[in-house]
């Protein structure tokens, strides 16, 4: 049975972890969100989030996006290969409600899964 938690070991925590992902990543994106991915040598996937104040001024909006992003990752982590992921938000992210954001992320995760299976 797959554990669906989001413990500390499932997060990208240090700048060096993020730098690794930014070097030659697999990229899937929409106008509002980009997900970068890079293979890791662990037995699980990890997630890092970047939500800029430039795109979402209020903290509660940034927290909402991060909360929904973590939840979508948590639910699909059993299907995701051993990759490190960084979710980068873009300008139109504030226009999406919770359901649209979750659907967009789900679509991007599924696109990533197909991309990995092809390669």
From Swiss-Prot:
Query: Does the record's keyword annotation contain Hydrolase?
Result: yes
Q: Which domain of life is it from?
A: Bacteria
Q: Reaction catalysed?
A: Endonucleolytic cleavage of RNA, removing 5'-extranucleotides from tRNA precursor
Instruction: Provide the Gene Ontology terms for cellular component.
Output: ribonuclease P complex
Annotated GO molecular function terms are:
3'-tRNA processing endoribonuclease activity; ribonuclease P activity; tRNA binding
Write down the EC number.
3.1.26.5
Q: Does the keyword tRNA processing apply?
A: yes
Gene Ontology biological-process annotations: tRNA 5'-leader removal
**Top enzyme category:** hydrolase
* UniProt keywords, alphabetically: Endonuclease, Hydrolase, Nuclease, RNA-binding, tRNA processing
* A Pfam family assignment: Ribonuclease_P
Q: Which InterPro entries match?
A: Ribosomal_Su5_D2-typ_SF, Ribsml_uS5_D2-typ_fold_subgr, RNase_P
Say what the protein does: RNaseP catalyzes the removal of the 5'-leader sequence from pre-tRNA to produce the mature 5'-terminus. It can also cleave other RNA substrates such as 4.5S RNA. The protein component plays an auxiliary but essential role in vivo by binding to the 5'-leader sequence and broadening the substrate specificity of the ribozyme.
Subunit text: Consists of a catalytic RNA component (M1 or rnpB) and a protein subunit.
Record family assignment: Belongs to the RnpA family.
By what name is this protein known?
Answer: Ribonuclease P protein component
Which organism does this sequence originate in? Answer: Histophilus somni (strain 2336) (Haemophilus somnus)
Q: What is the lineage of its organism?
A: Bacteria, Pseudomonadati, Pseudomonadota, Gammaproteobacteria, Pasteurellales
């Amino acid at each position: 049975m797959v554990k669906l938690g989001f413990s500390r070991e499932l997060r990208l925590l240090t700048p060096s972890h993020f730098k690794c992902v930014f070097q030659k990543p697999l990229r899937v994106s929409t106008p509002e969100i980009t997900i970068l991915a890079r293979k890791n040598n662990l037995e699980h996937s990890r997630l890092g989030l970047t939500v800029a104040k430039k795109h979402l001024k209020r903290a509660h909006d940034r927290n909402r996006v991060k909360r929904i992003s973590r939840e979508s990752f948590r639910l699909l982590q059993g299907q995701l290969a051993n990759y490190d992921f960084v979710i980068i938000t873009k300008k139109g992210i504030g226009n999406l409600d919770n359901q649209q954001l979750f659907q967009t992320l789900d679509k991007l995760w599924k696109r990533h899964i197909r991309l990995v299976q092809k390669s």
